[in-house]
Design a protein with these regions (language model features):
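Register position in tetratricopeptide repeats
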Residues: 46, 80, 112, 146-149, ...
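Canonical positions in the second alpha-helix
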Residues: 60, 91-94, 126-129, 159-163, ...
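Short coil turns that delineate tetratricopeptide repeat
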Residues: 65, 97-99, 131-134, 166-168, ...
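TPR alpha-solenoid repeat register
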Residues: 70, 102, 135-139, 171, ...
Length: 285
C-alpha cells in the first residue's frame, strides 16, 4: 500500500514516536490510540526497521486485540515470506471485516498469488459501491499502488488511469515507478524532478531518482541523490543502499564497504548486503 511520507514529518507523529521509544527504553507502558500505533508500525516498516515494526505490532495487539493495522502489517510480512497460510490467518484475526483495509488485504492476497482474475472481480464489484468522488480517487490510488507493489504494472496503470486528478502527487510517483519498470528512465526522471521541485524534503523521491541514475550507470548523480536523501533522513536504508552502490560504481570500494556495513547494522541478516560486503572485501584484498 502507498504510504504518505509527509505524515512522518508532522509534530504530533514525532511526539508519539518519541513517547513510545522512550517508554520502551525504560520498560514503561505507554497508551495511545490504535491509529497512532499503526502509524508508528508503518513508519518502522517504511524505514526498513522490520524488527521494530514487529515489536510495535505485538505491543499494539496486546492492547487492542483484533485491531486491523497490526494484523495487516503482519499479514503483509507473511506474504513477503511466502507464507500465505499465515497471511490468511492474520487476515481472519481482524475484528472489523467491514473496514476498507480488510478488503485491501484480501485483494492483496489474491494479487500476491497472481490470481488476477479474482482480484479484478473483487475490485470491480467494490468500486461499483463507492459513490463519493474523493473515496473513489483514494480507492483507485490504493488499488494502483497494490498492483505496482507486486509488479503487475499494466493492471496498476489501468486503475490509476481512471483517476480524475491526473496530477495527484502520489499517482505521479506510482506512474514514475511504472515507467522505471519499463526502462523509460527519462520520462520517470522528469516526473520525479517535478515532484522534488514541489517538495524537496520527501526522501523517497530522491531515492527513486537515485535508482534511475543507477540504472543509467550515472553514479555521480546517483550519489548526489543519495546524499540529499540521507541529509533528510540519515538512517533511511534505501538512501544508504543507493549511496553504497554509487560508491562501488565510482570505484570507492572502502567507502562502499563502510556504507554497506552501516546498512547491515540497520538490517541484520540481509543476504544482499552480506554479498555486497563480500564483493567489496574481495576487491580490497
Amino acid at each position: 500500500m502507498h504510504i504518505n511520507e509527509e505524515l512522518f514529518q508532522r509534530e504530533d507523529f514525532k511526539r508519539n514516536l518519541k513517547a513510545y521509544e522512550e517508554a520502551m527504553k525504560t520498560g514503561k507502558t505507554v497508551f495511545m490510540d490504535i491509529d497512532d500505533m499503526t502509524d508508528i508500525i508503518d513508519y518502522y516498516n517504511y524505514d526498513g526497521r522490520i524488527d521494530d515494526a514487529n515489536a510495535m505490532a505485538d505491543y499494539a495487539l496486546s492492547l487492542y486485540p483484533g485491531a486491523i493495522g497490526p494484523h495487516v502489517f503482519k499479514a503483509r510480512q507473511a506474504i513477503a515470506n511466502d507464507n500465505i497460510d499465515e497471511a490468511k490467518a492474520q487476515c481472519e484475526a481482524i475484528d472489523d471485516k467491514s473496514d476498507i483495509d480488510y478488503f485491501y488485504l484480501r485483494t492483496e492476497l489474491e494479487i500476491a498469488q497472481m490470481n488476477y482474475e479474482e482480484s479484478e472481480k473483487m475490485i470491480k464489484e467494490a468500486f461499483k459501491t463507492i459513490e463519493d468522488r474523493e473515496d473513489k480517487e483514494n480507492f483507485l490510488l490504493d488499488i494502483g499502488a497494490l498492483y505496482v507493489d507486486y509488479n503487475a504494472i499494466d493492471l496498476g496503470e489501468k486503475w490509476l488511469d481512471k483517476m480524475e486528478d491526473k496530477e495527484n502527487k502520489e499517482r505521479l510517483e506510482l506512474i514514475s515507478r511504472i515507467l522505471c519498470n519499463r526502462s523509460e528512465y527519462d520520462e520517470a526522471a522528469k516526473i520525479l524532478e517535478t515532484l522534488i521541485d514541489k517538495n524537496p524534503f520527501i526522501y523517497r523521491y530522491w531515492n527513486t531518482l537515485g535508482l534511475i541514475h543507477m540504472c543509467r550507470n550515472d553514479f555521480d548523480e546517483c550519489r548526489n541523490c543519495a546524499e540529499y536523501s540521507l541529509a533528510i533522513h540519515p538512517d533511511n536504508t534505501d538512501g544508504i543502499w543507493c549511496l553504497a552502490k554509487a560508491m562501488v560504481g565510482q570505484g570507492e570500494i572502502k567507502g562502499a564497504l563502510a556504507t554497506f556495513e552501516k546498512f547491515l547494522q540497520i538490517m541484520p541478516n540481509c543476504a544482499k548486503a552480506e554479498l555486497e560486503i563480500g564483493s567489496c572485501l574481495v576487491q580490497l584484498d
